[in-house]
Amino acid sequence: METLFSGIQPSGIPTIGNYIGALKQFVDVQDDYECFFCIVDQHAITVPQDRLKLRKQIRQLAAIYLASGIDPDKSTLFIQSEVPAHVQAGWMLTTIASIGELERMTQFKDKAQKRADGVPAGLLTYPPLMAADIVIYNTNIVPVGDDQKQHMELTRNLVDRFNSRYNDVLVKPEVRMPKVGGRVMSLQDPTKKMSKSDDNQKNFISLLDEPHVAAKKIKSAVTDSDGIIKFDRENKPGISNLLSIYSGLTNDSIKNIESKYEGEGYGKFKGDLSEIVKDFLINFQEKYASFYNSDDLDDILDKGKEKAQKASFKTLKKMEKAMGLGRKR
């Protein structure tokens, strides 16, 4: 069975877009792959974090994974910082990465421009750590969005470089992009991706938003003025985005939804979608609360840590042997 790896930062509550574009799709592939789902808290500290808030968000994200349908008997759910092999392998890959290729990363350049107080080295070395997250589990498939595509290209280059310079130790991962309709955009600016870090609260729906507040956000979402419910990302980005949300939460095809609302106005469509979103959040948050407040959550994370440590140790030892680190035993 092939291995799939994905990591999410505990830097805020995931949005309904993260659920439709990632979490929901993870649930669907649990039977097809050996899945490792990682809460990447060491990536989160590349920007300043309040320690108590970070700890809370780590637990919240774990509960959100489980509420989404991740089954700990099928998948490995764990916290990055509890598996030392991540940073150990990350340092090894950092030694074969060049400053130039790290500085060319678009995310580094964007974030560096916003840091008037100096650029942390961790922002620059983020990609080799991300590469290590992936390769230490002999990952075959990595589901990523467009924003991580450049990092994945670097990961594949680092794998080639390591295998060429040392031994053919690392598995070269393949990138899997989200399915069509799986990308959810901002509610007020549907030309950009929905983001949990957006300054405008009306642009996104958090998975822990009050359901009635989320319903209002749907009703006030930007659309065009022609009143035709049709998926056309280029010419009708607003209504296309709402169709993606409707389809993602109901599992109904966009084509069927278009037929259902043929001749109907946006008011009827938005009203129905707002109820769908509200009902989804009520159900989701009930599951979330049951996991967040349960001792079972810690048992699940402990089990995941042990499994991840065992799996990553094997690859780490191969990397160390290939590079000549430590003593021969």
Swiss-Prot record:
Write down the InterPro entries for this protein, in alphabetical order: aa-tRNA-synth_I_CS, aa-tRNA-synth_Ic, Rossmann-like_a/b/a_fold, Trp-tRNA-ligase, Trp-tRNA-ligase_bac-type, Trp-tRNA_synthetase
Q: Motif ('HIGH' region) spans which residues?
A: 10-18
Catalytically driven reaction(s):
tRNA(Trp) + L-tryptophan + ATP = L-tryptophyl-tRNA(Trp) + AMP + diphosphate + H(+)
Task: Give the GO cellular component terms, alphabetically.
Answer: cytosol
Q: Example GO molecular function term?
A: tryptophan-tRNA ligase activity
Q: Which PROSITE patterns match?
A: AA_TRNA_LIGASE_I
**Residues annotated for ATP binding in this entry:** 9-11, 17-18, 145-147, 184, 193-197
Q: How does it assemble?
A: Homodimer.
Q: What is this protein called?
A: Tryptophan--tRNA ligase
Species name for this entry?
Answer: Staphylococcus epidermidis (strain ATCC 35984 / DSM 28319 / BCRC 17069 / CCUG 31568 / BM 3577 / RP62A)
Q: Which gene encodes it?
A: trpS
